[in-house]
Amino acid sequence: VCLSLTVMSVDPDCSPEITAMIGASIALSISDIPWNGPIAGVFVGLVDGKFVMNPTREEREKSLLELTVASSEKKVVMIEAGAKEVSDDDMYEAIMKAHEVNCETVKFINSIVAEIGKPKFEYPSCDVDHDLFEQIREYATDAVKAALDTDDKKVRDDRLQVVYADVFEHFGEIYPEMSDETVAMINECMYKLQKLVVRRWLLDEQKRVDGRRMDQMRPLNAEVSLLPRTHGSGMFTRGQTQVLTTATLGPISDQQLLDGIDDQEYKRYMHHYNMPGYSVGEAKSSRGPGRREIGHGALAERALEPVIPSVEEFPYAIRLVSEVISSNGSTSQASICGSTLALMDAGVPIKAPVAGISCGLITKPDSDEFLTMVDIQGV
């Protein structure tokens, strides 16, 4: 599915991102393409202690909160936020109010669909072969459990390779003329089996693959001043995830000029994120930044922005670069922690240290019950 969203005209008081989100939802909803929408989006600000839905440009400049919420009629599907140390209660209330507004927009979209929407086309199911899955589950469950049960990702991957090889050897005897379709189906069944094992550990035993509790973080380590010629540097390690962030200071003339659809503006605090192939054991060439690098860089930049001193207090341009040395989940959050270390090492008088951590949510089938976990890692 390809959606083309083109900004034809801009009203400074109306966010083009929200308009594009709702427009995309309408386009999919009235088409014959099956999907689980519609969804709607809204921007929430906090101005003078009151929540403002889709604030004007002037209100956004005063707002303590920049929150974008996308949701269906029943559930939230996406949250993006930046805030000047807003309380947990205020953030929760803002999300709930945003969902109420989105529900009204979804009703509006449904009324459009009722008038001009096309019937959704039918397509063949891509579910795994149930009989084959049951055979694999019976044969390989114990081996998969033993392979997954370790806190070392490399060891886990090596064990799983052995299990996969054994499964293919065993079922190669049952299906001697194994087609490409059968190979793909066995791989899909093995993935489904791993998912089933992990979900049962989480939901039934509150156990994670590395043995941690749901609220337990991996071992932490932090170092500063690792690089002798940089203005500041910080290495943050959480489990097998490791990020090295450097801080470079320059004259205010080094700030970045932003020339987008809004008025020209300057950015004196910049954060860039790089994740080379070696961090995940891949041999790949270094190209320009992709969506991951741009998105993670912006996320970590936004996390530190509220604590950066004003230009009157600290008249310098600040550039941070986070290099992912080793990745096993939560590299964006590690780059936030590394950025705090590098800024303090460079002598930047930030208002408060900032840390980041990833959180996950898992729900029970056909139930509203759920469990949350902190510090997600790769499996």
Q: Where are the regions a protein language model picked out?
A:
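Flexible, glycine/charged-enriched surface loops at secondary-structure junctions
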Residues: 1, 36-38, 105-123, 154-155, ...
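Extended amphipathic alpha-helical scaffolds
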Residues: 121-263
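Conserved phosphate/anionic-ligand binding catalytic regions in large, soluble enzymes, centered on
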Residues: 14-33, 223-247, 328-350
